[in-house]
């Protein structure tokens, strides 16, 4: 946890997020290790898309202030996402050793979180950069809504966590109509 606090401060000073995957692009498929309700899981994007749209939200690190808010707000909104037929998955490269605990405490067991590999960070262009352009090793705060067809329906990058939930829910509900 000692390492988390200086890096959390750095996340707010980091360069703004720039997502290269645009609306209509094919979402890269991936399989990642993670946790749900405190238990280890394997998340497979291709399998999740067979059930419906996926809200894929990247966040800097488990147990940091903004990420706690984002996870708790997504957890509170899960009934609305489920009603729209969507699966929510949080993915991070920060504090991945704490995902089991984070999934139980901050996600309230409502959705899975997974560890971002270097390949996932690269394919989704979510490597959080320092002001000098070097990597922090964490992921930036970017949310993708992926339609059942595997195409990006929405992309939103901003450090303010609450807007990710409202924007992604609106995008998922638009897919339903």
What are these regions (language model features)?
Residues 54, 59-63, 95:
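Short pre-active-site segment immediately N-terminal to redox-active cysteine/selenocysteine motifs
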Residues 32-53:
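A short beta-strand-turn-helix
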Residues 68-111, 120:
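Structural microenvironment flanking redox-active thiols in thiol-disulfide oxidoreductases
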Residues 4-34:
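N-proximal helix/coil linker or "cap" segments that precede and/or mark the start of modular domains
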Residues 36-37, 117, 149:
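Residue-level recognition of short loop/turn positions
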């Amino acid at each position: 946890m000692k390492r988390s606090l200086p890096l959390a401060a750095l996340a707010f000073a980091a360069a703004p997020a720039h997502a290269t995957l645009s609306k209509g692009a094919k979402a890269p498929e991936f399989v990642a290790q993670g946790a749900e309700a405190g238990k280890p899981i394997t998340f497979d994007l291709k399998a999740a898309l067979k059930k419906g749209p996926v809200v894929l939200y990247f966040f800097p690190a488990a147990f940091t202030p903004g990420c706690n808010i984002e996870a708790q707000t997504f957890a509170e909104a899960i009934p609305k996402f489920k009603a729209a037929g969507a699966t929510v998955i949080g993915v991070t490269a920060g504090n991945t050793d704490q995902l089991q605990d984070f999934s139980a405490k901050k996600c309230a067991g409502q959705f899975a979180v997974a560890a971002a590999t270097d390949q996932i960070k690269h394919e989704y262009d979510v490597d959080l950069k320092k002001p000098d352009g070097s990597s922090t090793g964490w992921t930036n705060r970017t949310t993708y809504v992926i339609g059942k067809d595997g195409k990006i329906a929405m992309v939103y990058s901003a450090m303010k966590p609450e807007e990710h939930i409202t924007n992604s829910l609106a995008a998922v509900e638009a897919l339903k109509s």
